[in-house]
């Protein structure tokens, strides 16, 4: 009913011509009165511009309504033109609605202060420097920062891993496997990391955009070195440097393999002849045991979400397990500035692990390193088999960390 009423306001219902004519005729001696529809909207015909014939304006005589015997004029006959709705009323209503909506929007005053924090115009990156370097930007998300309001070390490591995979894809080397070339897929080979070295000069914060550059080089006869350089995309400040060594492993036998010539032919054109972005940490990693470890965390087990597509624990997860045994006072007053990891064997989903840590003062005489701590780490299975050996370096977060440093020293004593 409402729809009918609204429609009739713009498109009036007309009576049939027969009934209209019959009302205008004389019925015996009674003269009919003109019928006027109360809901109709009429348009004057003589309001239109006069027509032109052969370039000459032709005069027209306004159409007059018919007159009855009393001399009263009857309305002009109904046509399609004078039954059209008054569109000006409809346009005025639409304009009013838009103006009201615009006013309401202005009252909200929603204006983002930093567009770079809410806009993510990043794809999978691009190949630069003659096709040898891959570059990709990342925006630091709110769920990627920790208690210090800075990106966690796991976030940075995930960025390194993501750029490595995207580098292979952009170079056209990604086969059916995860990070494996077509020839590697044919031979059931995968890449595994054996050594990782990272130095963090400064951690990015929420909303920062970091640029990660990565490239690969040869490492001996059967290895590949991958380097990363992380910087602030706006200022160019170097934030993180990392280098790693990778070797091949047979996915079925889980044994290390030499690089086949077919695979070497695929990857060598992308090798960059350059020195490592970090000098190799030549200091030997110490093997801890129950007698030398100061902090032990037992009962660590992988979750299903910790496994990658190759059905072994993601190497980034190992870092989280190593830090499980780091003393809380160090985590509260210091930040991780460097780490060196040696991966000894893979870890499956049914493994049960132990994390061991021991703390030592910085053995350097450089005054810049005053207040720093070095930690030795071991991640092992319950049966004693080594998974990862590691060393981390921690620097004070701020000048007020001296109280926590005294607490750490007291606990060790």
UniProtKB/Swiss-Prot annotation:
One of its GO terms (cellular component) is chloroplast. Its EC number is 3.1.2.-. The active site is at residues 310, 312, 347. It comes from Gossypium hirsutum. Its main location: plastid. Residues 12-79, 394-413 are annotated as: Disordered. This is Palmitoyl-acyl carrier protein thioesterase, chloroplastic. One of its GO terms (molecular function) is fatty acyl-[ACP] hydrolase activity. It is found in: Plastid, Chloroplast. It catalyses: hexadecanoyl-[ACP] + H2O = hexadecanoate + holo-[ACP] + H(+).
